[in-house]
Amino acid sequence: MKKVEAIIRPFKLDEVKIALVNAGIVGMTVSEVRGFGRQKGQTERYRGSEYTVEFLQKLKIEIVVDEGQVDMVVDKLVSAARTGEIGDGKIFISPVDSVVRIRTGEKDTEAI
């Protein structure tokens, strides 16, 4: 099993969710996060003053899938979340040793 974590622009969430659900993904976790990458924040104006926002609002999507689904999930994330501009985000893939569904006690593949 693998955990796919994607950092995306907030306004892309609906598009990403639809793409993943249509591809058969039945669960995901979404968290509000803040960070910066190459774009290093942005300059904004408020009441005539200019200030720099160093950490930008993003969303983190976490999905645990069988190894055979990873490439498909990554393809769906990239196609749905891409704008072509700096700040589109990143995808991280890491191994998952085990999963337990708390309600039933099911483990691993049956739990996802």
From Swiss-Prot:
Stored Pfam families: P-II
UniProt modified residues of type O-UMP-tyrosine: Y51
Top-level taxonomic group: Bacteria
MF terms in GO: ATP binding; enzyme regulator activity
Stored PROSITE patterns: PII_GLNB_CTER, PII_GLNB_DOM, PII_GLNB_UMP
Keyword annotations of the record: Nucleotide-binding, Phosphoprotein, Transcription, Transcription regulation
GO-annotated biological processes: regulation of nitrogen utilization
Residues annotated as signal peptide: none
Entry-annotated residues carrying Phosphoserine: S49
InterPro entries on file: N-reg_PII (IPR002187), N-reg_PII-like_a/b (IPR011322), N-reg_PII/ATP_PRibTrfase_C (IPR015867), N-reg_PII_CS (IPR017918), N-reg_PII_urydylation_site (IPR002332)
PTM section of the record: Phosphorylation dependent on the nitrogen source and spectral light quality.
Complex formation: Homotrimer.
Protein name per UniProt: Nitrogen regulatory protein P-II
Phylogenetic placement of the source organism: Bacteria, Bacillati, Cyanobacteriota, Cyanophyceae, Synechococcales
